[in-house]
């Protein structure tokens, strides 16, 4: 709530009521073609859904699109050399983009392109993850090898990957001597970085060099396993994507909804 008033006898005015979905609702509306904010506002004003027939001459219906939509944040880190791009609870994004595709991987790839991240079609990926993520890292490494990428990892991560029978090279952390990850990134030998760390101040400080080296050399990086897994799915579509218009997708949805019998 945003409230304004002065003095003990002041009239208090409620200037704003924010439902904390101010950016998610427009995204879902754009993904489905449904004016959710308008529908919700009319419900709050007392108008039942059945009476809201302004959309295609029918009452609002649940929409389950046959495609995927992904919202991705845009960050300004490349404008601030030397800053650690690891994310925390504070707001750091300066905008958002949306990727739409017939598969999750295609939508993910489009969202990354829109946000300014370039995913390689070939090359070497470095993986260094915390212990809790090693099992998931094995699957990611296996998928990368199947896609034709070379995989290198720090000692502990490499051991977990190798134990699963996935080919992997070993690269040093900075504290273990040269050549280390930052050296390979600066030399152009790494095209993609997957790195996760324990959420402790020391672990974050120790791994800062990986993130800053990737940022300084414009190497795309991911700092969560969810991000790494999604990016790996996107790499499966790196050879080409199909451009689609939201208008055409929404029209197809409307055709399907028009054929849906009333409840």
Annotated model-derived regions:
Residues 31, 35, 39, 92, ...:
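Conserved active-site and cofactor/substrate-binding residues in soluble primary-metabolism enzymes
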Residues 172-173, 178-263:
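Peripheral docking tails and interdomain loops at the edges
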Residues 31, 112-115, 139-146, 167, ...:
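Short, solvent-exposed amphipathic alpha-helical segments in soluble enzyme
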Residues 120-192, 196-204:
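Conserved structured catalytic cores and adjacent interaction surfaces
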Residues 10-16, 26-29, 53-54, 82, ...:
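Short acidic, glycine/serine/threonine-rich loops at helix termini
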Residues 1-5, 16-19, 72-74, 101-102, ...:
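Active-site proximal loops enriched in glycine and acidic residues that flank catalytic Cys/His/Asp
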Residues 1-121:
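ATP-dependent carboxylate activation and anion-phosphoryl transfer catalytic cores
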Residues 56, 77-79, 84, 88-95, ...:
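Catalytic domains of riboflavin
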């Amino acid at each position: 709530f945003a409230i304004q008033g002065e003095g003990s006898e002041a009239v208090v005015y409620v200037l704003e009521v924010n439902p904390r979905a101010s950016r998610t609702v427009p995204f879902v509306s754009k993904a489905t073609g449904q004016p959710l904010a308008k529908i919700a506002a009319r419900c709050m004003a007392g108008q039942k859904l059945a009476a809201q027939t302004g959309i295609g001459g029918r009452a609002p219906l649940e929409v389950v699109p046959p495609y995927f939509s992904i919202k991705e944040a845009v960050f300004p880190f490349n404008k601030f050399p030397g800053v650690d791009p690891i994310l925390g609870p504070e707001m750091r994004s300066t905008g958002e983009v949306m990727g739409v595709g017939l598969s999750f991987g295609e939508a993910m790839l489009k969202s990354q392109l829109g946000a300014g991240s370039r995913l390689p079609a070939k090359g070497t990926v470095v993986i260094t993850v915390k212990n809790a993520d090693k099992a998931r890292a094995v699957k990611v490494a296996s998928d990368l090898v199947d896609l034709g990428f070379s995989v290198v990892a720090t000692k502990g991560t490499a051991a977990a990957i190798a134990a699963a029978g996935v080919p992997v090279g070993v690269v040093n952390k900075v504290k273990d001597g040269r050549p280390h990850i930052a050296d390979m990134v600066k030399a152009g030998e790494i095209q993609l970085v997957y790195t996760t760390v324990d959420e402790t101040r020391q672990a974050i400080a120790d791994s800062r060099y990986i993130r800053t080296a990737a940022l300084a050399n414009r190497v795309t990086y991911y700092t969560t396993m969810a991000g790494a897994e999604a990016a790996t799915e996107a790499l499966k579509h790196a050879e080409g994507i199909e451009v689609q218009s939201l208008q055409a997708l929404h029209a197809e949805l409307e055709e399907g909804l028009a054929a849906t019998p009333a409840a």
